[in-house]
Amino acid sequence: MECVRSGALDLGRSGNFLGKSGSTTSCGKVRCSTNLAGSTKCEQNLHGKAKPLLLSASGKARGTSGLVHRSPVLKHQHHLSVRSTSTDVCTTFDEDVKGVSSHAVEEKVGVLLLNLGGPETLNDVQPFLFNLFADPDIIRLPRLFRFLQRPLAKLISTFRAPKSNEGYASIGGGSPLRKITDEQANALKVALKSKNLEADIYVGMRYWYPFTEEAIDQIKKDKITKLVVLPLYPQYSISTSGSSIRVLQNIVKEDPYFAGLPISIIESWYQREGYVKSMADLIEKELSVFSNPEEVMIFFSAHGVPLTYVKDAGDPYRDQMEDCIALIMEELKSRGTLNDHTLAYQSRVGPVQWLKPYTDEVLVELGQKGVKSLLAVPVSFVSEHIETLEEIDMEYRELALESGIENWGRVPALGCTSSFISDLADAVVEALPSASAMATRKVKDTDSDMDMMHYLTKMFLGSVLAFFLLLSPRLVSAFRNTLQ
């Protein structure tokens, strides 16, 4: 995700903060133009409450792929209803059925696309980074020390902005993520119409314009009566889909308009047949460019997360990523493509352990083993942004060539690929909430089972060390050198 290369985040607390390029409103985000109900309480009940519950679909609905599925659901502070619609598990908010009467009788379907966001100009980089690092789902501090989140986010973003500016300058001066996401939204609207579903499409970004709060405000103005929420992350992680969904939950539980609004959330969709086949199509196309396609190593590079997210917080991201790769390779094998493949994780920051193996280290190892042709596949991303255009296309390509790899290729992000957009439209249709009542699922608070003093000590010391080593790439390099 763009968080490592740039960074800015959810500013859930009330209070004003002045950034370099502007001020905040009570919604807490740098230069945010909205002031929505509930936005000043974004940091309540966050740490330890976002542990996902792994659910299995209870049945297979018409038109589904039948592929293996695991999908997480975040804990909701009030009543959270969960249902299975096809292979995707959808979360439905239905806290106050009396509120349904306040909505118009005429059905108006809305689809909310959630994404990371990215700075559109170099002046946006520092406040974007602030928003990123202020997110408690990006840098997880114990509740006791969460008052440090915003000051440290300011410190980190200020020190990291010059380096991030260089990266964005190298790809044209800003992130193309918003433009591409808008194009995907338009394409999805057309695809839904072709499937006889008229829907209004909204885009809500986590760390830059248009913020999720702005999209929610427009949904209210448009009097939407059914809403499908679709994070544009194939695999679920606490730090991506989870963070965006948490913001949405906080808004929903505080806003009377949403009390009776049926909302279905598609938490992950990497297992969908349309997505898997679309990825296989792109890989096959890029393999054909090589003079020796059968000898090319397929190199899946996924965005990494700290190992503690998986071990301590129960993030299903690693399991879902491995399942995703297995499904794509199974599809390629069925087409006669039998290339070797490997998976590595990119974009780690600081001295803490992230998911391994690391992309940069694996590239060097492959070169040493004599691999000559490599096709990089950015599997966490459906849009081009700084981690594909700068980190993979520039940094990793250069490293690969220096390591002895002679032929380099890269699969583009899915973007507006017609088969991919069509499958997203199918997912939306399948996820539309039903009118029937749903059973509430209780999510266990796993923090209560942990040794609290051990947990607080581990998280605090690790977070403080990570914060200071995040400040400068030179500090990170110096720290690593002392370990060698």
Swiss-Prot record:
Question: Which InterPro entries has this protein been placed in?
Answer: Ferrochelatase, Ferrochelatase_AS, Ferrochelatase_C, Ferrochelatase_N
Which BP terms in the Gene Ontology apply to this protein?
heme biosynthetic process
PROSITE patterns according to UniProt? FERROCHELATASE
> Sorted alphabetically, which CDD domains does this protein's record hold?
Ferrochelatase_C, Ferrochelatase_N
- What's any one GO cellular component for it? chloroplast
- Tell me, in one coarse class, where this protein mainly resides: plastid
Its UniProt pathway annotation is:
Porphyrin-containing compound metabolism; protoheme biosynthesis; protoheme from protoporphyrin-IX: step 1/1
- Root EC class: lyase
Any one Gene Ontology MF annotation carried by this entry is: ferrochelatase activity
Reaction(s) catalyzed by this protein? heme b + 2 H(+) = protoporphyrin IX + Fe(2+)
What's in the keyword line of the UniProt record?
Answer: Chloroplast, Heme biosynthesis, Iron, Lyase, Plastid, Porphyrin biosynthesis, Transit peptide
Enzyme Commission number(s): 4.98.1.1
Where found in the cell? Plastid, Chloroplast
Q: Name one Pfam family in it.
A: Ferrochelatase
Source organism, top-level taxon: Eukaryota
Iron among keywords? yes
Q: Which family does it belong to?
A: Belongs to the ferrochelatase family.
Q: Do you know which HAMAP family this protein is assigned to?
A: Ferrochelatase
Role:
Catalyzes the ferrous insertion into protoporphyrin IX.
Tell me the protein's name: Ferrochelatase-2, chloroplastic
Q: Which gene encodes it?
A: HEMH
